[in-house]
């Protein structure tokens, strides 16, 4: 998985310190106040470290009925194949991602997982740093959301949890609406190495409908690079969409009011990587076969839909 923005900042700050170029230090000998960059990076790292105990089963139990009702009425969420997920033990759930920063597919699946397996089963969802540091971050943490990193995911898996990861991240979630029915992980294979290292099965989770909750126009990757957002905030894109209440929404930093598109999620059969690919598996082959299978499943879901939004 990619290095977090805070991790990159900490690494840069450390290199500056070693090279004597730390802008936060003054005078000969490097005396003076610590680098603002280092202090900021350390603070962000502390906030984003996976606190698995932040997940609150009682809180989930209290809020699940109303949240599921609201989600069902607005998105008409339908989740199929939950019985394919192993009943216990660690598992890596790998999904395609849609809907900008609102990500209704995550909401629908998270609620369904807790309803099906019970709130006591440990279940964590990996999310972008900006989500965890937003005003709704504390609420999401209580539902099991942690910052997306290899370390956080491994910690949860080692603890016996089910972990939901979206390899496509901010790239896939902001793909243009006319590419709605496309799996696009942007070549990111960290989830495969994570599953191999942790010795857990992969369960693909394919969803459709999220990219109909707004009109997504562009990833905005050139603009993000020009503004150095990839370095500062770990953002590879500065997407543009047409959505309420902003009409023209640049960055989707504050989210948007999603259109009530029907969200359908299909859970696929679990994959034991060692059993299927041997003790020295080819990561490229695994990636190609998993994404191809997920694309075929997404194509089937797309064929079922009659009209955008209505499903």
Give each language-model segment a name:
Residues 2-152, 220, 254, 299-311:
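Membrane-anchoring hydrophobic helices of lipid-metabolizing enzymes
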Residues 126-128, 166, 205:
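Generic beta-sheet signal
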Residues 166, 172-176:
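Short acidic/His/Gly/Ser-rich catalytic and metal-binding motifs that mark active-site loops
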Residues 255-311:
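C-terminal terminal-subdomain/extension
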Residues 139, 155, 193-197:
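Hydrophobic/aromatic ligand-binding patch that stacks against planar heteroaromatic rings
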Residues 169, 179-278:
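A cross-family acyltransferase "interaction/gating" segment
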């Amino acid at each position: 998985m990619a290095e977090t923005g805070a991790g990159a900042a900490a690494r840069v700050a450390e290199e500056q310190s070693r090279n004597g170029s730390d802008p936060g230090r003054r005078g000969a000998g490097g005396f003076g106040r610590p680098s603002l960059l280092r202090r900021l990076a350390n603070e962000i790292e502390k906030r984003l470290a996976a606190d698995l105990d932040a997940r609150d089963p009682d809180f989930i139990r209290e809020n699940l009925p109303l949240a599921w009702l609201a989600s069902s009425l607005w998105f008409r969420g339908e989740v199929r194949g939950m019985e394919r997920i192993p009943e216990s033990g660690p598992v890596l759930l790998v999904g395609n991602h849609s809907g900008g920063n609102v990500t209704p597919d995550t909401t629908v699946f998270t609620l369904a997982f807790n309803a099906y397996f019970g709130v006591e089963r440990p279940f964590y969802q990996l999310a972008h740093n900006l989500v965890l540091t937003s005003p709704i971050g504390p609420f999401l943490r209580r539902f099991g959301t942690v910052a997306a990193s290899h370390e956080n995911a491994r910690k949860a898996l080692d603890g016996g949890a089910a972990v939901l990861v979206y390899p496509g991240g901010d790239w896939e979630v902001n793909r243009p609406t006319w590419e709605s029915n496309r799996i696009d992980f942007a070549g990111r294979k960290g989830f495969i190495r994570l599953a191999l290292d942790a010795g857990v099965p992969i369960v693909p989770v394919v969803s459709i409908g999220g990219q109909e909750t707004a009109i997504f126009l562009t990833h905005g990757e050139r603009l993000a690079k020009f503004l150095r957002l990839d370095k500062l905030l770990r953002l590879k894109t500065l997407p543009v969409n047409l959505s309420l209440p902003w009409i023209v929404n640049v960055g989707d930093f504050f989210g948007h009011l999603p259109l009530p598109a029907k969200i359908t999620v299909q859970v696929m059969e679990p994959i034991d990587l060692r059993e299927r690919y041997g003790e020295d598996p080819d990561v490229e082959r695994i990636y190609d076969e998993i994404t191809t299978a997920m694309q075929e499943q997404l194509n089937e879901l797309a064929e079922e839909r009659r009209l955008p939004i209505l499903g």
